[in-house]
A protein has these predicted regions:
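Domain-scale recognition of functional cores that engage charged ligands
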Residues: 1-145
Length: 147
């Protein structure tokens, strides 16, 4: 599993090591271990995606706009009890593509992860890794959930 806390530091990491701003902006990432960030997250749970900082698989996360009031309340208690374990990000509008589901086409959310090779020259490979949210309406595009 990767540590999602690093997402919050990416603009500073790029600036420090490369001496330049990021070309493609990073998704804003709120660290629940930070008092101001945690206060913002708790006030905006209905707008944010909250993830465990050191876990993978797309499980145990809260997609605020799709969560019930009770689910948001339970997550607020988890965040308060163990703030270091959580980060939050805005809910993104993912692309949709036709996907074969049960023998016919249906629209599903996807994400695309490009690959770049670095050596004497830098190459952006054509295509990339595309992951799909197979559950209708889901925003969770994770290979461990069939995507």
């Amino acid at each position: 599993a990767d540590d999602k806390v690093v997402y919050a530091y990416m603009p500073r990491i790029v600036k420090y090591y490369l001496g330049e701003e990021m070309i493609i902006p990073n998704v804003p990432t709120y660290l629940c271990a930070e008092d101001d960030d945690r206060a913002y997250v708790l006030e905006h749970l209905d707008e944010l995606v909250v993830k465990a900082a050191n876990e993978s698989g797309g499980y145990g996360m809260l997609v605020g706009p799709h969560a019930t009031a009770l689910e948001r309340e339970e997550f607020a208690a988890r965040i308060t009890a163990n703030p270091r374990n959580y980060i939050a990000q805005p809910t993104l509008a993912l692309s949709r593509v036709p996907t074969i589901v049960d023998g016919h086409f249906e629209g599903r959310h996807v994400d695309l992860r490009p690959y770049i090779l670095y050596g004497r020259d830098i190459y952006v490979l054509p295509g990339g890794l595309t992951r799909v949210a197979l559950k209708k309406g889901s925003l969770v595009v994770n290979s461990s959930q069939g995507g």
